[in-house]
């Protein structure tokens, strides 16, 4: 960026997962119901600020948790945040651990994913919307924004949180949990944690040219571990209740830091990548 140029303004979208979508983190909250070319997002957008940084919070499963993972309108959620001017999206997600060293209550700033979903639209460029013409072949070697991840990792260290600085998330279709055979297979594939929502959310954010990062909260050991209680809804909710403040404090401390940083080059590169990944129809 040339000297004297105005730094890029940032606006942070926050997508809250199960038990991690508390709107109280925002100051001066207002609600905004929107529609998109892809339908309605999961719930109202909650607009507000965290230490003077503009933020938009969206409950991934709806505020009453009525939307199962396969039915979340991921296209509408990301499109709505993009249209609201979000430059970044930081999400929270509950997950199961596939590694002994990733304990329930730990935070993982994931850097890779494996997709085991089967029923989800993974692109805006589906041939049905004039707002997204062409075919998009978005690069996915680095799915998550490295710069945003680095801020989250450094902030977690300063807060004294048990945080793993990388991890591969395997996303399953759900809503059922894995069988033991599947859980063990996923370990052999190199997955560290497992959830039901990272894909296609991260893919769509990349298509939208948004800096996307995820705060994953381990709630259980899935079902691979012998002599350990297998994952259940009760166990997930219990661990989230005991540890949700960790994700909350990480968001509240990281977002002002992001707001104070220079993002012009990063945002330019994200938008350029998204733009040049689209093949337009020949005329």
UniProtKB/Swiss-Prot annotation:
UniProt binding sites for substrate: 196, 220-222
UniProt-annotated site: Important for substrate specificity, residues: 178, 233
- Lineage, opening ranks: Eukaryota, Metazoa, Chordata, Craniata, Vertebrata
Q: In which pathway does it act?
A: Amino-acid biosynthesis; L-methionine biosynthesis via salvage pathway; S-methyl-5-thio-alpha-D-ribose 1-phosphate from S-methyl-5'-thioadenosine (phosphorylase route): step 1/1
Positions annotated to bind phosphate = 18, 60-61, 93-94, 197
Native source organism of the sequence: Bos taurus (Bovine)
Self-association or partners: how does it assemble? Answer: Homotrimer.
* Role this protein plays: Catalyzes the reversible phosphorylation of S-methyl-5'-thioadenosine (MTA) to adenine and 5-methylthioribose-1-phosphate. Involved in the breakdown of MTA, a major by-product of polyamine biosynthesis. Responsible for the first step in the methionine salvage pathway after MTA has been generated from S-adenosylmethionine. Has broad substrate specificity with 6-aminopurine nucleosides as preferred substrates.
> Which family is annotated?
Belongs to the PNP/MTAP phosphorylase family. MTAP subfamily.
List-wise, which residues carry N6-acetyllysine? 51
Entry-linked InterPro entries: MTAP (IPR010044), Nucleoside_phosphorylase_d (IPR000845), Nucleoside_phosphorylase_sf (IPR035994), Purine_phosphorylase-2_CS (IPR018099)
One GO term under biological process is:
L-methionine salvage from methylthioadenosine
Q: Which GO terms describe its cellular component?
A: cytosol; nucleus
Q: Which reaction does it catalyse?
A: S-methyl-5'-thioadenosine + phosphate = 5-(methylsulfanyl)-alpha-D-ribose 1-phosphate + adenine
Alphabetically list the UniProt keywords. Answer: Acetylation, Cytoplasm, Glycosyltransferase, Nucleus, Purine salvage, Transferase
Q: What is this protein called?
A: S-methyl-5'-thioadenosine phosphorylase
Q: Which Gene3D superfamilies match?
A: Nucleoside phosphorylase domain (3.40.50.1580)
Q: Name one GO molecular function term.
A: S-methyl-5-thioadenosine phosphorylase activity
Query: Cellular location of this protein?
Result: Cytoplasm; Nucleus
**What is the gene name?**
MTAP
* EC number of this enzyme: 2.4.2.28
